[in-house]
Swiss-Prot record:
The keyword Nucleotide-binding applies. This is GMP synthase [glutamine-hydrolyzing]. Catalyzes the synthesis of GMP from XMP. It catalyses: XMP + L-glutamine + ATP + H2O = GMP + L-glutamate + AMP + diphosphate + 2 H(+). InterPro entries: Class_I_gatase-like, GATASE, GMP_synth_C, GMP_synth_GATase, GMP_synthase, GMPS_ATP_PPase_dom, NAD/GMP_synthase, Rossmann-like_a/b/a_fold. ATP binds at residues 226-232.
Length: 515
């Protein structure tokens, strides 16, 4: 198979480095992010077609600031430096830096200068809006560089060395706020680097199936199915590669949504002929959760119990060599961050403890992909919309949406309320417009009036948010008529609820889930 065209992105700690990778991939070119400690020899061995230097929060003059190995600029491939990357490049090649009197954050109007290929197709007679986020700046470009962009406060907002195909911009072309950002990145990829747009999900599927078949050979793989898109795509890809030597296990932990377990199992068995075991372990999980109110304790109990159950079921299969997981590219990036993983806000429920416990080799077919790419792969595989566009659902399930103690009665109330939320979002056309929507059962009761009588019953909170990647989120501005209909149905149809409230908190400072 012909080698994949590849762009290497060097990460200097910007919060939006992943956006660079996504913009490149959206253009049909494969990209990888590597920490700034990577060496020029390591990058050379990756055979990149181009290199992009990301932004970052540091100042080039700081003692512990990330550095740039000069060899990265001598690979003979085009280079695009962004923000901190531009300052680092300017410093290394003999330019002069200065500290801005005030840090510049937000929009700026860029004047395009000269005949720079980055500006191809952009109207040069007017300014274009870009997004800035910097403290330092390049005061004098290095030898061989021409100034190709300026703003009212920045004489060197962009510079270019056409002979060496090295370009630098002080703004962030990867963010949506930069009006011509996508065009600028595409101009770098196709007009400067002259790359091929050969990264497609159909080519990924073909390659993934071939590689998994070669890796597994005649051995067996076990896969934990949750019914979510990631594990389902992993299972279907593996099934195409190795057939019945894939063993899927779906564990019902007792905190799934209404009828969810049986519906998922029935669909996957019927449409994909998966070798699938449905383990009904509800009682085992709920007994361990009895009386537990602390959310972190709930997560740990569910995680540890899942590992116990899954381990028992996998051992019962006999000899299995591989464990399949739905690891995505953001997980991989986080694990090799230039500063190490970020602070843990909540423990993540996954099967991370299984490979060591079971002595299995990991197989992670989606580790190159972002979430939106997984959805495209699902489409290539013929998965239905209800799986492709299913809202994210936490591993601990409803256990962290029942605030406080978990009981059968409280789970029943939440399941019925959540079913109404999902149904109304779908029937109104809002389900695919929002990132996530669900109900939360609060640990309190309030006074109400129904008919001629006083009530003292439970409160349901609605959490419906807009997001791109769950890193940040904002509450969804749903029509008041839709919110009214959801509230009315829950109060009238779910016994034990007399009040519905709408969560209008953003992330940050709040998280999407309540626990």
């Amino acid at each position: 198979m012909e080698a994949q065209t590849k762009v290497i992105i060097i990460d200097y700690g910007s919060q939006v480095t992943q956006l660079i990778a996504r913009r490149v991939r959206e253009a049909g070119v494969y990209s990888e992010i590597h920490p700034c400690i990577v060496t020029a020899d390591q990058v050379r061995a990756m055979k990149p077609a181009a290199v992009i230097l990301s932004g970052g929060p540091a100042s080039v003059g700081e003692a512990d600031a990330p550095t740039l190995e000069k060899g990265l600029l001598e690979l003979g491939v085009p280079v695009l430096a962004i923000c901190y990357g531009m300052q680092l490049l300017g410093h290394n090649l003999g330019g002069q830096l200065a500290t801005s009197e005030t840090r510049e954050y937000g929009p700026a109007d860029l004047t395009l200068l000269g005949d720079c290929p980055l500006w191809d197709g952009i109207d040069k007679s007017a300014t274009t809006r870009v997004w800035m986020s910097h403290g330092d700046k390049v005061k004098t470009p290095p030898p061989g560089f021409a100034v190709v962009g300026r703003t009212a406060t920045l004489d060197v907002a962009a510079m270019a060395d056409d002979a060496r195909r090295i370009y630098a911009v002080q703004f962030h072309p990867e963010v949506h706020h930069t009006e011509e950002g996508t065009r600028i990145i595409n101009n770098f990829l196709f007009h400067v680097a002259k790359l091929k747009a050969d990264w497609t999900m159909s080519s990924f599927v073909e390659r993934a199936i071939k590689e998994m078949a070669e890796t597994v050979g005649d051995r067996h793989v076990v896969c934990a199915l949750s019914g979510g898109i990631d594990s389902t795509v992993v299972a279907v890809l593996l099934h195409k590669a190795i057939g019945k030597r894939l063993h899927c296990i779906f564990v019902d932990n007792g905190v799934l949504r209404l009828n969810e377990g049986q519906e998922v199992v029935d669909y996957l068995r019927e449409h994909f002929d998966l070798n699938l075991k449905y383990v009904q372990a509800q009682r085992r999980f709920l007994d361990k959760l009895e009386g537990v109110e602390d959310p972190e304790q709930k997560r740990k109990i569910i995680g540890y119990t899942f590992i116990e159950v899954f381990d028992e079921e996998a051992k019962a299969l006999g000899h299995v060599d591989f464990l399949a997981q739905g690891t995505l590219y953001p997980d991989v990036i986080e694990s090799v961050s230039h500063k190490g993983p970020s602070a843990v806000i909540k423990s993540h429920h996954n099967v991370g403890g299984l490979p060591e416990k079971m002595n299995l080799k990991l197989i992670e077919p989606l580790r190159e992909l972002f979430k939106d790419e997984v959805r495209k792969v699902a489409g290539e595989l013929g998965l239905p919309d209800f799986i492709i566009w299913r809202h994210p659902f936490p591993g601990p399930g409803l256990a962290i949406r029942v605030i406080g103690e978990i009981t059968e009665e409280r789970l029943d109330i939440l399941r019925k309320a959540d079913k109404i939320v999902q149904a109304e979002l779908m029937s109104s056309g809002w389900y695919r417009k929002v990132w996530q929507g669900f109900a939360v059962l609060l640990p309190l009761k309030t006074v109400g009036v129904m008919g001629d009588g006083r009530t003292y019953e439970h409160v349901i909170a609605l959490r419906i948010v807009d997001s791109v990647d769950a890193m940040t989120a904002d509450w969804a501005r749903l029509p008041s008529e839709l919110l009214e209909r959801i509230s009315s149905r829950i109060i009238n149809e779910v016994k034990g609820v007399n009040r519905v409230v709408y969560d209008i908190s953003s992330k940050p400072p709040s998280t999407i889930e309540w626990e």
